From Swiss-Prot:
Protein name: Retron Ec83 probable ATPase
Lineage, opening ranks: Bacteria, Pseudomonadati, Pseudomonadota, Gammaproteobacteria, Enterobacterales
SUPFAM superfamilies: P-loop containing nucleoside triphosphate hydrolases
Organism: Escherichia coli
Annotated keywords: Antiviral defense, ATP-binding, Nucleotide-binding
Stored InterPro entries: AAA+_ATPase (IPR003593), AAA_GajA/Old/RecF-like (IPR041685), P-loop_NTPase (IPR027417), Retron_ATPase (IPR053498)
Amino acid sequence: MEQNLPSRITKLIKKSESGDFASSYQLYKVFGSKEYGVEPDEKMSDYFKELSAKQLEGGQLRVADIHLENYKGFESLIMDFSMKKNSTILVGNNGCGKSTILDAIQKGLTHLSSRLSTRSHNGDGIEKHELRKGQNYASIAINYDYMGIRFPMIIATTEPGYEDRAKSNYSGINELGSIFKTAHSINPNVSFPLIAMYTVERANDVSTRDIENSEEIKEAQIWDKFKAYNKSLTGKADFKLFFRWFKELIEIENSDNADITALRAEIRAKEKDLDNPLLKALLAENKNSETTKKLLEDHQNSLKVLKEKLNSYYSVNSKTLHTVEDAMYSFLPGFSNLKLQRAPLDLIVDKNNVSLSVLQLSQGEKTILALIADIARRLTLLNPNSVNPLDGTGIVLIDEIDLHLHPSWQQNIIPRLEKTFKNIQFIVTTHSPQVCHTIDSQNIWLLKNGQKFKAPKGVRGAISSWVLENLFEVAQRPPEDKYTKLLQEYKNLVFSEKYASEDARKLGATLSQHFGPDDETLVELKLEIEKRIWEDDFEKDQ
């Protein structure tokens, strides 16, 4: 059907032909409906749908925003996730609604997952008991973003007789799922996005049973991309399935070429080149010079060539195995040489050159191992043709990300997640200042009394006690503690000019003995006393 098309449509066609997904998608919509002032043309609509499917590669899937109405404790909440960085942190007291927001997003993701991986349009709904008390309807509205296009959805439920108050609508994600399926029919190796949720139950102990029972999983496993969505939103990393999968990969790996081992060692050495402290300092001093830019460009190009060469050597299974290993080693410093033990059946890893069963690791180490292994396994299945499957896109929700982690690990968890999984959007909850002070304030939401608030400026890089007091609204010292009260009493004596009294001297000595003379507050009070004595002496001399 020939049409005289408006200039805005011809401009879209030019952009579409140059590879712009957003333009192709808009044209698919334009020719498929009368809403846009152009005569519908089914053939043209199908053409641009297929073209947009071919242009999917390289995009990032994101939750752009969410709107809750009468869902659990929230009357109305709109939360924007279109931040600069990939991670968003939700903080607040117990019961403030952090997990409720993750649950709401998870419900939406079940609908998206089914549209990507199956022919059904199943997904979780809002249960009657999840309606806010006294209300007759509830809804969860989510906007997903893919390559600049918004794909909306609404999950709603109503009491009988109030059906007009809210209605579910899945048209946006139906279209997104349809485009991905079209892309898969054109190219079965096209990358799909990861969708996963990890609740506090992910920390359930990795046990001997997980290893022993892995044999219950039948031999005939087809590890295709759609298996990556299996149980991805149930909340727990499936270590039993991971062990079975890892065991099969190792059995295949045993027949691999020695060239792969040498090439991988060369790549690791190349990647470590820029970590040299002296070289880092030199590059930082001359970061804008042409020589520095050329050096970095040459380094990246040579690394790319090596990785492409490695990719050509690899079987899919061998590449997958090393991808998962590398991900785990990046999170567990000092760990290496993950291997299978046949009798008794076990998974062994070297920790600081000492071989240990994974069952002997600390709870925090096992929690990280299971989490990272699960994410990496799913990404490798979803990105079968990628040089680095860990660069795949997706959305991952993690409740209480600090669970079982030492404070130093809490401090590193978000930066390492972002470094290892560069294109994943992480939405996490935490009670830890150590997690928060590695993230810009604009990426943190504070929840309180059913409302959201932006974090105060300066969280990133701040000392933990400042974050504790200014973000979490927790006093730096326990207010009801005996020594906190004594310290406040001593402070009052100093600032009321009674620092020379017997009570003040005794109190100062007691506190110095308890906290040590280098306590920050005691040092400040000592300087304050010296200043006041100097001022008194100065006045006497006048």
